[in-house]
Amino acid sequence: VTTFCTMTTDARADIAQRLRAWQDKAYRTLAFACAPCEEIRTTGLTLQAIVAISDPIRTDVPAAVDQCRQAGINVKMVTGDTSATAIEIARQIGTWGPNTPAEAQITGPDFAALSDEEAYNRVQRLRVMSRARPTDKQRLVNLLQRHGEVVAVTGDGTNDAPALNHAHVGLSLGSGTSVAKNASDITLIDDSFNSIVKAVMWGRSLYKNIQRFLYFQLVVNVAALLLVLAGAAIGTELPLTVTQILWINLIMDTFAAMALASLPPSAEVMKSKPRRQTDFILTHRIQWAIIVVGLLMFAPMLAFLVWCERETGANAGMDVHELTLFFTTFVMLQWWNLLNAKALGSDHSAFHQLLSDRTLLLVMLLVLVGQWGIVTFGGEMFRVTPLSFKEWGVIILVTSPVLWIGEMLRLLRKSPSPSLPRGERG
């Protein structure tokens, strides 16, 4: 507006200085000018006033940005404001620091002037883009995607629509335009950046819960498969009947899926870095855990199976009582391992916030009561016979090391390694 006004050079310089000072404080400025005229004029106006408007950031934004940084999420600010205003806002939210290099900021026209190769090499280091146009935002998204990044874009205006549409996840604001909402995948009703952080936490927690269920189910299947194969190799009848396997794989696994999927989200997942899109859901660590735990369950059960086959002649084979002990022991091993599955991928104890995981406790109770009901009343259908309370106590006791060994391993992993004096370090 000042370019349309008639004023002295000194006055114009004074106004420019004031504007820079306000922009450095992240103020947005609005100028008023007038002139007597019968039609619109763009020259000879008289400057009336300049207003500096403060649009303070929300108090929860800096903490949310810091959470993103800890989670390995790189936050970039793209705005139509001037460079000075954009950098000050970035400083307030925590994406710009005193040691941030100048090349981490660029204007939209300068970004458009870069060649594709130059922009590609620089785009990951950018933190602030000012005076950005719709094409600049879209180009930024496309270049980040070429680097293999998963890109989420927030916006509320019509000019944000191209970037929202091309991003992996487009997030429009509830107060935004209908064009932005139609181009986005998710609408933030509360217009809060913190909601994005919560969505990431929920998504990562759900992914972790799926890993936990797969770990639990595959341990059951590995151990059961090995036992069936071992029984065939030894020449004995199947140690687990079809109905027993149905109870283990169908009912128990369904309950376990409900319990593990309902575990509440944990802020702990925000301390880990993002996974690659090509990563297999079962990490090498989980795969080894499935194999090792499955074998550790298989070994004592195999020893029990061999011991039950110790007799020869007319009494050869496992009687119903021994089959019941075998079946119940196997189920209780999985019952204890459900707590290990809860703590999978965490350094916390399996008992951490256990009382708040009511669905898990309910499922464990249902499995325990269901197993008791099958053993007590299953009869010929499940090929079982009732067990005494003493036998139940012994089975629960001898199978509990599955949990205690897991607890010790988590404790050792959580404990910091003792530091060596400087002279003893390699």
Regions found by a protein language model. Give the residues of each.
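Alpha-helical transmembrane segments
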Residues: 334-338, 402-411
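C-terminal membrane-solvent junction of multi-pass transporters and transport-like membrane proteins
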Residues: 282, 286, 346-366
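Extracellular/periplasmic helix-loop-helix junctions in multi-pass membrane proteins
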Residues: 376-393
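Hydrophobic alpha-helical transmembrane segments in multi-pass integral membrane proteins
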Residues: 300-304, 365-380
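Intrinsic disorder/low-complexity segments
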Residues: 414-426
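Membrane-embedded transport module
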Residues: 100-153, 167, 174-346
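Basic, alpha-helical nucleic-acid-binding regions used in initiation and control of genome expression
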Residues: 164
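Cytosolic catalytic headpieces and adjacent flexible linkers of membrane translocases
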Residues: 1-143, 147, 161, 173-175, ...
